Amino acid sequence: MRPNLTIILAGGSGSRLGLSTPTQFFKVAGKMFVEHPIDAFERNPHISEIAIVSNPFYVADMENIVLQGGWKKVKRILKGGKERYDSSLAAIRAYSGQDVNLVFHDAVRPLVSQRIIDDVCDALTRCEAIDVTLPAVDTIICAEGDHIGSIPDRSLLQRGQTPQAFRLSVIETAYERALKDPDFKVTDDCGVVVKYMPEVPVFLVPGEEANMKLTYKEDTYLIDKFFQLRGSELPAAPASLDALRGKVAAVFGGSYGIGHDIVAQLYAAGTRVHAFARSTTGTDVGSRESVAEALQ
């Protein structure tokens, strides 16, 4: 079986956020951003080796981080370049000629899950190129100046994340073709394959909202909250709803959707249910006073 090698892309400079410190060195949940994905890929049994592509001015810093982290799978620290594709090319050239898969991941996506890594590695046993995506939730427009030119069908649109994974020979050939194009311009590695090796289909693996990228300062608060949610251990659910028979339950948002379904299941289990919602009881769950009044 072809080995899966993870490439952590940590070549950013922090300029997009207007900062002098690269974002991969920001701290969240007690660690630098770059440490979290290294931890995740280190733990995954499907990953054989990890290489980190660093901003050339911070290679020594990255070496110190690796020494302190004690990760056994980190074998190389490579120098990136000015553009994102320069970092990808550094890894491709470092492993050129080897029969391996490369799994590229942004250092500033600290919440990549084991489920995503597992699914990507599983797909690599059948496919030569993989992207991780989520459905578009907002309406996307194509602008013509300061007017709407067209509105694509949202059901066909996906938001790209990482990891993006490839058989090395595929991504290497795609970049060889791309670099011969004087108008070469893409934003990620899957874009290179789609444009320059259209004969290779790119398989889609479902992503996760938590697998977000640090792009703006405000993102740090969202990412920190995702870490808090991930770290919260929920109590084990009862084997059946029989344990709730004769109990009393309060359900906020119980007039429709998931809340309505929960109310129905509780009623069926013999639970005494009090359902509150703005549309039925005038309860505003965003107001402490309104919630307190409902519970009196």
Show the residue positions of the predicted features.
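NAD(P)H cofactor-binding loop motif with strongest signal on the N-terminal glycine-rich segment
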Residues: 30, 107, 254
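Rossmann-fold cofactor-recognition segment
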Residues: 77, 278-290, 296
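Conserved core of the sugar-phosphate nucleotidyltransferase
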Residues: 111-203
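Conserved glycine-rich Rossmann-like NAD(P)H-binding loop of the short-chain dehydrogenase/reductase
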Residues: 50-51, 270-283
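Conserved N-terminal catalytic core of the sugar/cofactor nucleotidyltransferase
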Residues: 34-99, 181-182
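N-terminal glycine-rich phosphate-binding loop and ensuing alpha1 helix
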Residues: 2-59
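Conserved N-terminal Rossmann-fold NAD(P)-binding element of oxidoreductases
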Residues: 11, 249-253, 276
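N-terminal Rossmann NAD(P)H-binding glycine-rich loop of SDR-like oxidoreductase domains
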Residues: 14, 255, 263
